[in-house]
Amino acid sequence: MDLLRQKLKAKSKRLARYVKCTKKKQQNHLFNTNEKLFYRQLSSAGTNNYHNLPSKDELFDYWSSIWSYPQKHNEGAAWIESEAGKSNIAPMMFDNITTADVNQAIGQINSWKAPGIDNIQNFWYKKFSSLHEVLASKFTHILQHPEDIPAFLTHGLTHMLPKTANTQDPSQYRPITCLPTLYKILTSCITNRIYRHVDQNNILAEEQKGCKRGHQGCKEQLIIDSVILRQAQKQCRNISTAFVDYRKAFDSVPHSWLISVLNIYKINPTIVSFLEASMKQWRTSLQVNINGQYIKTNDISIRRGIFQGDSLSPLWFCLAMNPLFTMLNNTKLGFNLKINKNTNCTVSHLLYMDDIKIFASNQQQIQHLLDVTERFSRDVRMQFGLDKCRTLNIEKGKIINGDLALPNGEIIAAMQNGETYKYLGFQQARLLDQKQSKSKIRNEFSQRVSSILKSELNAGNLNRAINTYAVPVLTYSFGILQWTKTELEDIQRTTRTMMTKYRCHHPTSSVLRTTLPRKEGGRALCDIINLHNKQINKLRDFFVTKSLSSNLHKSVIGADKKYSPLNLADPNMDLEITTDAEKHVKWAQKALHGRHHHDLNQPHIDKIASNRWLADGTLFPETEGFLMAIQDQVINTNNYKKCVIRDPTITTDKCRRCQQTSETIQHITSGCSTIANTDYLRRHNQLCNIVHQKLANKYGLLNTYTPYYKYNPKAVLENADFRLYYDRSIITDRQVTNNRPDIVVVDKKAKSVLLVDVAVPNNNNVLDKYNEKMAKYTDLAIEVGQMWHAEKVEVVPIIVSSTGLIPKSLEDSLKKLDLHKNTFIDLQKAAILNTCHTVRKFLNM
């Protein structure tokens, strides 16, 4: 019975190991091929508790009620005539689509962006460049003859992603439409031309940052907003604000208004005719695919709203909203942003796509501005999402309650004391809520780092995932929230602590190495302090540049007296950036950590090759962290405990095995006589196995491949041209003491002999070991040359240090053996894996 229990335990352990190995391969393959999908699966792990789905008819009926029933805007609105009467807009000219236009459009689209019903990703259009001239010709023809638009070109495929756990409600889905790649390329060509026209004629309002190129988007708006709110608070000024949210803004714009606004801004009639014709053919089918449950609806005609999924839709929507900004600016109302006693700038609104924030000096002004906004919205048949609209009135530093009534009778609720509103990702009331926002960001950052560390990614992919999935949570807040250096250091410390918790980082390993590039001996984690400072400096430069042409930016610079993290009013502020060179200097100065830096920079060491295992990043995170701790010499040896951390319980630093010398990490990795014939020999033999098998395959002595740790070399392999000895004594005429090299290669035709000997010394013995091997087998080389009538006999030392340092001589040795120059990668990996195993085993004794 006990035997069965033991067998069951062994099988269970093997199964768990197999499952973990399979998961590791799958996750790393997914990460390398589709990083976005990996993150999506990571974020949804444990949250896919979706059970009930809406029926196909319910899904169809709900979304067709939004999209399929056309509405017309109020063509008689007075403001439309005023907007159309602008004389400073030059008519847009039409030019044929050129090959250069197609090249530019294809280059702007992600190679592997999900395709539509065509199932052809943009990658193939990029690679088949011979098609570009044909596409340019066809696109030009379609623009000039919209009646020839192929039916498939305007057919979308909409994936419905659940927004909440209530998956039975069809309204609780977010539609993501995938359009045919050809349609996206065509509309990208159109977008580039429309954008040039819009830019040249300065059509888009300065307050709109939703699709403006060369701007900072949400961050720019939030910085301006912060300066306004802080000035109002510091100077105890009255301020009234309103947050306006539209109900399904993109999905509710009438097609009649979309065409009308193109004509108002004098877009070329050929392009307008094409877009008008294509709108009549817009249609999409909805599909839901959750937990194996699949639903696909019939086609839904799009008769209202913008066909989302291409680069034209955001610009088109911004143009549709643009007259509102003219109307608001024409009121001459707003908050007066003071630069000095005699100069101010009136700001009435800020906008990012459909997120509108309105500013005024008092409640009467905010009422008037909201009335203007409501009138515009009513004329273009767009509705406020009143549950997400709020007003805030502050008089003499106090929040004044009082809802606002719109002309149509709807009420916008006023914010109460203690209530906050989420604007462009940050909670705010009278000011941005710094404490709550920081806490939320730090929690989200920690959750993402934790989910990454729980995965089975290899070390390189894991660190890359932290940089690309977790760090951006922080990056968005840089320049908006007031982060102190202490807080940023604490975030970096928290990251290292979490890595230590998951056995990916030794608690006393070098901190400097974590943020250095991998090719320079680091782990390439993002330096958050440097990133923060670079962002601040970049944003400051942006505002200064924009101030040359923008009165708003110029005013914000003058007003920002430590109101935002940028402190724009101070022209001398320049945050320090710690360079990699400075980090190397500090690393080299460390008493323990600096020893590896010294070894790495010796003239006989190939620095790039020595760091190749880090650059590849294919090891387990635990193994990588452990080896770096070995290199940093912070392993709990007796010498470290007695002489470095001064452990009072340690009375001697002698080796626990041989009791001869001090137990340093160098002694354990390559200096203890008691494990020379076991652990060191196994490590040495595995490197020999790699070289022997590669030579045997090269010379046709073997035609199979076996993992080096399972490979068992034969003492003699021979064919008509080559003979290969392994660990075999060479019988000589005169007595030669050192007559047993690891490998002997005899080339019968060339009459040459190579005496190959492998060694895995400590870092400080690499050069001495090479010279020792050359001297050791010189006598044997002479004897072999005379006995075997060889025209050429060479000694070829294969030296790799116990922690993976590669001497420059190894490249020459591999050339002599005619092996691929990257063979050192396998040798290095075998050496460091065995070293890690040896140290772990030794410390457990």
Where in this protein do the model-derived segments appear?
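Short, conserved micro-motifs composed of acidic
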Residues: Q383-E419
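Basic, alpha-helical interaction scaffolds
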Residues: G409-K485, L539-S550
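Conserved pre-motif C helix in the palm subdomain of viral-like polymerases
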Residues: Q168-N201, G217-I223, R247-F250, I302-F335, ...
